[in-house]
Amino acid sequence: MQRSPLEKASVVSKLFFSWTRPILKKGYRQRLELSDIYHISSSDSADNLSEKLEREWDRELASKKNPKLINALRRCFFWRFMFYGIILYLGEVTKAVQPLLLGRIIASYDPDNKVERSIAIYLGIGLCLLFIVRTLLLHPAIFGLHHIGMQMRIAMFSLIYKKTLKLSSRVLDKISIGQLVSLLSNNLNKFDEGLALAHFVWIAPLQVTLLMGLLWELLQAFTFCGLAFLVVLAFLQAGLGKMMMKYRDQRAGKINERLVITSEIIENIQSVKAYCWEEAMEKIIENLRQTELKLTRKAAYVRYLNSSAFFFSGFFVVFLSVLPYALLKGIILRKIFTTISFCIVLRMAVTRQFPWAVQTWYDSLGAINKIQDFLQKQEYKTLEYNLTTTDVVMENVTAYWEEGFSKLFEKAKENNNNRKISNGDNNLFFSNLLLGAPVLKDISFKIERGQLMAVAGSTGAGKTSLLMMIMGELEPSEGKIKHSGRISFCSQYSWIMPGTIKDNIIFGVSYDEYRYRSVIKACQLEEDISKFAEKDNIVLGEGGITLSGGQRARISLARAVYKDADLYLLDSPFGYLDVLTEKEIFESCVCKLMANKTRILVTSKMEHLKQADKILILHEGSIYFYGTFSELQNQRPDFSSKLMGCDTFDQFTAERRNSIITETLRRFSLEGDTSVSWNETKKPSFKQTGEFGEKRKNSILNSINSKRKFSVAQKTSLQMNGIEETSDEPLERKLSLVPHSEPGEGILPRSNAVNSGPTFLGGRRQSVLNLMTCSSVNQGQSIHRKTATSTRKMSLAPQASLAEIDIYSRRLSQDTGLEISEEINEEDLRDCFFDDVENIPAVTTWNTYLRYITVHKSLMFVLIWCLVVFLAEVAASLVVLCLFPKILFQDKGNSTKSANNSYAVIITSTSSYYIFYIYVGVADTLLALGLFRGLPLVHTLITVSKTLHHKMLQSVLQAPMSTLNTLKTGGILNRFSKDIAVLDDLLPLTIFDFVQLLLIVIGAVVVVSVLQPYIFLATVPVIAAFILLRAYFLHTSQQLKQLESEGRSPIFTHLVTSLKGLWTLRAFGRQPYFETLFHKALNLHTANWFLYLSTLRWFQMRIEMIFVIFFIAVTFISILTTGEGEGRVGIILTLAMNIMGTLQWAVNSSIDVDSLMRSVSRVFKFIDMPTEDGKPNNSFRPSKDSQLSKVMIIENQHVKKDDIWPSGGQMTVKDLTAKYIDGGNAILENISFSISPGQRVGLLGRTGSGKSTLLLAFLRLLNTKGEIQIDGVSWDSITLQQWRKAFGVIPQKVFIFSGTFRKNLDPYGQWSDQEIWKVADEVGLRSVIEQFPGKLDFVLVDGGCVLSHGHKQLMCLARSVLSKAKILLLDEPSAHLDPITYQIIRRTLKQAFADCTVILSEHRIEAMLECQRFLVIEENKVRQYDSIQRMLSEKSLFRQAISPADRLKLLPQRNSSRQKSRSNIAALKEETEEEVQETKL
């Protein structure tokens, strides 16, 4: 950034905004970059403004019981606000004085008033000076008010952000991210844009009073006729506005539904393509779009009539004021023209300025009250710590996630008793809600310094809540907690802040090379970092999108380990790691590097429990066991079933198993929701073996019993707006649907329907607490890999054993939150936060306009029709101008003039001009009303928007993943939200206003030129100056606006990033650092916005200066050349005064049109994306039948094999190479292998080795080379749809879109209810679906928020069964599954896919044991592909990954594989207690 010229600018330069000339010149000649923008002044700095307002707000909180934020704002900004308001009032007063001088000039041409004729020239000079004074007063005042509004917004932005970092977790659980974004975008933008109008709430009444007094002198009591009409018109416009808002509110719901579905499709585009659902998704969105457009048209018609009413009101107010007076008393031309000028000013004050001012105050006060309520919410309370304490002690602690639960519990219980909803077991009813019970009950333990305590338990047992209570996030209601307070924390869901890898690990702590390298080595990050060209200085944006899930997890762990603390809280840090990496990190990092530190590790792995000093097992919030591992084996031999949350599944009967499935899944389904967190109450049930059978959990479905959603605090569903854990698309990409700018978006669009946050059916929004608990879900494999040669980097860490060193032996210097932030400049912020820079011209090209016009044939005809109507109106005006004087006043000498004439209108030789002016008013009214062209134009433009949306949707759905991988999800969503909103709402009426204003100006110029040809000579250079000035300004303004839009994205992205890592921020005490970073983002946006406001005011001032010159020329030409024509002078000057506002309005509208057309350019850019090649090749022929329709039928054993393809599922892969993006590095190279029909193949490899990539390559979702054949048919010889239908897919990223169960299972409607129920029963979903009202017709929203991750995996499994595919691809199907669902999936795979080829990528050892062959991927290549017995007999990755006990389990399979000629799936023996222990939860 550069130093601002404003600092050294003179008073004159500031007054005329001349200091912006350098940036305007540079923007016209070249493309502006962020470095070209000027630094802001200290008075606009977010630090200073926030400190100022925070000081006044604290003063307000301390001095009053009912603090008011508006009082704090008043003390900060009131006097400057009033100063500019007075200047604005003086500028508006000049408008009221101008008609007086106009009347005097007209009167000077009265033949009976020879005296004033001599001073006409001085009156003309006075009139011109009034315009000059108005220009010099108005623009600085408006700019000053915009500046104050900007400062108020900045101060409140900062205040809200600081408050957000202090909010308690209980409050965050009740606030949606959409509400926070809306608070920062929708509400606070009102200060920027509306503060200049706020003063008109008192200026407009004063101005109306002054004007009515002046009009009284001319028309006496008849003045109130015109005022009454304006008041009625104002109420009419208010009614039309209310009607328009009703349509918009109705449409907002439809827009929201469309955007929710669109967002889900974009986030899950890989799944959509894998399922071949493009056409089904397109049909769903187009149906919603059709309903939306009906309401859009209604709102546009009403808004069009409202806009037209303002234009034609000018004629009627003059007519109603002048006509009664003229009929009774007669009138002279001076009064007519003076009245016209007064009425124009009066119309603006009554119908525009005052209503807008009232609306501004209403919106602003509403926003202030919302912010005030937010600032008074409960804050996070830091626990009292004793720094000298070395142990961690918890004594009889009980805690609730929610306060005041008793009333809610009783109410819900009463409602539930009335409903008596069955859960599938006739002996049980959901009579208890998950309310009232504490999340932790009577917890006591003690950990000595240097000990490792492992915390285990079933899902929802309270493990994460225990850590939150130690950190102070969960306040205990009973008991005591003692520790030193020096805590380090690693979240279960890895959180990456914007910045480099090094910044993420150091995290504001002083840098120490020795410690840093040791941590890097212990966390197995050396090899990963060496692959990046920038090493650990690579900038990570959007939550670490360029990293795999395992890499993010290790960076989060390294951050926790690097900090020197007394207590380390590690919440399931190994969830995304492969078995070997997990084992190495646990031994080298947790056990050796941190050997002298106190550690609490949440885990369920038996190896971890064996090495822990203490073990704490939680069950339903209570301590099930506390002690050592040997004590655990002696005292609790049944502990493994408690870890699982169930007894041996196979021991139950089918009926009892189904009941357990229902109850367990229902328990997990509640964990996916995001409102208030409760633990579960239990009720005795039927008898069954084991302790688990003694009690069963009962619950009420959220969607049935209450509009308010209840959830437990420990979430395993990991849901954020319905998007599940993934290795494909990161969660942040959806959340950059912020106002981009945008969604997300970024992240969210600027339209009101989106900025408020997606509101799903039932009014449910995603809470901030849930956002925090799934901060890195969906962040899986990298899609933008910048890897160098994969040579392992030499370790810089000490070569001694990690057990022999102590990296914490010396205390580093005092941690500082400013150390890193001072090094972060604007370019770093751009790399971390900004969306990709749009590659579109600074000014909309003519090609874009031409292409837009030709999108729909009817638009061209409508534009031609508009031109024909205008030419007819101009021709009629010229005819009237020529014929009226001849027809009405053939005898000029017979005309007389007297003040006491009995005629209503004094007949003079100049009265013909008065009649002509009335006709011009009527013509302009017809032009404004536009009944024969306005409505068709608006209607057609909306139709064009419909066509563009349809084409863009088709283009996105048909685009290859290699193209979509280069785009950010928020950017794609912005096209369907913000840009389509522009095409629907703003562009049609803006084009209409511009065309209308342009024709009015042209008509007025023609009339004036005909009356006085010399004026035409002055008009030509003025119009040329306008065009040149517009072109000069437009290049810079559009670039500044784009930079401002880009600068808005970091603000909202940083807010979301901070919320997702809030627990980590508090644990590390990095709030000041993040506040500083937020202020830098605010300052960056302020620099762009302030410069845009300044250049805009420069342009507006030059426009008025050019007009002042034009008006001076018109005035003196009229006075010096008109002669005795009193009417001629009046009409020329009156039209000239009207041209000023209209022409300036037209120029501004043209700029708005150009700005809005940039949305059209972006839409065209998406429409022009390449498409996937779906054309069949003639080389493909079915073996038995040549009909292509039969090839499209994908069946399995239920249809004769002679009629279908594929028939067996044999796969042959030859030299397969795969890339994610064009020109990127190959993720897989020269992969070759073959799979026999019905064989089960397991994929092995470290995290990020390319296992998921191989599955995507099978589906042709990547840039691939080579060949794959299925049953002898090559993928190049059939269409993509045919190829992908050969596969059944269970992706790692589960896709549940907003719709019914039936639509989610069968979007094309191919299967009957009987078939769907059969499959649902087969996969264990029947009892779950039957719980919901409507059953298959129950509408799932928010990505299936009432379903657990296990439910959703079963939905995917049901889809695969329905597809009857012969090849099944499974990508981490057991990730984050509860044990019951995992058992169901395994059994369904054995039964429904017994004869199918199965390719499995899995981290669970027991799942991999069922495979006959294994494919080992390492360094982008196949390292080994062999049978189980060969893999176990050799030194291989598979042998290293499994324990000796697991190898023994494989003996039956090894023997059976030797005896069988075919590699069919071996029958699995029943689960044993030992297998259960190894299950990873």
UniProtKB/Swiss-Prot annotation:
Please give the Pfam families that the UniProt record associates with this protein: ABC_membrane, ABC_tran, CFTR_R
Know the name of this protein?
Cystic fibrosis transmembrane conductance regulator
| EC top class named in words | isomerase
Q: Which residues bind ATP 2?
A: Y1220, G1245, R1246, T1247, G1248, S1249, G1250, K1251, S1252
User: Which residue positions carry a glycan here?
Assistant: N894, N900
The reactions it catalyses are:
ATP + H2O + closed Cl(-) channel = ADP + phosphate + open Cl(-) channel; chloride(in) = chloride(out); hydrogencarbonate(in) = hydrogencarbonate(out); ATP + H2O = ADP + phosphate + H(+)
Q: What job does the chain carry out?
A: Epithelial ion channel that plays an important role in the regulation of epithelial ion and water transport and fluid homeostasis. Mediates the transport of chloride ions across the cell membrane. Possesses an intrinsic ATPase activity and utilizes ATP to gate its channel; the passive flow of anions through the channel is gated by cycles of ATP binding and hydrolysis by the ATP-binding domains. The ion channel is also permeable to HCO(3)(-); selectivity depends on the extracellular chloride concentration.
Family recorded in the similarity comment:
Belongs to the ABC transporter superfamily. ABCC family. CFTR transporter (TC 3.A.1.202) subfamily.
Could you tell me the membrane topology recorded for this protein?
Multi-pass membrane protein
Q: Where is the composition biased (Low complexity)?
A: 1453-1464
Q: Which residues form the ABC transmembrane type-1 domain?
A: 81-365, 859-1155
Q: Where is this region: Disordered R region?
A: 653-831
Which source organism does the UniProt entry give?
Muntiacus muntjak (Barking deer)
Membrane-crossing ranges are 78-98, 123-146, 196-216, 223-243, 299-319, 340-358, 859-879, 919-939, 991-1011, 1014-1034, 1096-1116, 1131-1151
Q: How is it modified after translation?
A: N-glycosylated.
What does the annotation say about its assembly with partners? Monomer; does not require oligomerization for channel activity. May form oligomers in the membrane. Interacts with SLC26A3, SLC26A6 and NHERF1. Interacts with SHANK2. Interacts with MYO6. Interacts (via C-terminus) with GOPC (via PDZ domain); this promotes CFTR internalization and thereby decreases channel activity. Interacts with SLC4A7 through NHERF1. Found in a complex with MYO5B and RAB11A. Interacts with ANO1. Interacts with SLC26A8. Interacts with AHCYL1; the interaction increases CFTR activity. Interacts with CSE1L.
The UniProt entry, under PROSITE patterns, shows: ABC_TM1F, ABC_TRANSPORTER_1, ABC_TRANSPORTER_2
> What does the UniProt entry say about where the protein is found?
Apical cell membrane; Early endosome membrane; Cell membrane; Recycling endosome membrane
Positions of the UniProt region annotated as Interaction with GORASP2:
1387-1481
Task: Present the record's domain note.
Answer: Binds and hydrolyzes ATP via the two cytoplasmic ABC transporter nucleotide-binding domains. The two ATP-binding domains interact with each other, forming a head-to-tail dimer. Normal ATPase activity requires interaction between the two domains. The first ABC transporter nucleotide-binding domain has no ATPase activity by itself. The PDZ-binding motif mediates interactions with GOPC and with the SLC4A7, NHERF1/EBP50 complex.
Q: Which domain of life is it from?
A: Eukaryota
User: Lipid attachment of type S-palmitoyl cysteine occurs at which residues?
Assistant: C523, C1396
According to its UniProt record, where is this protein mainly located? membrane
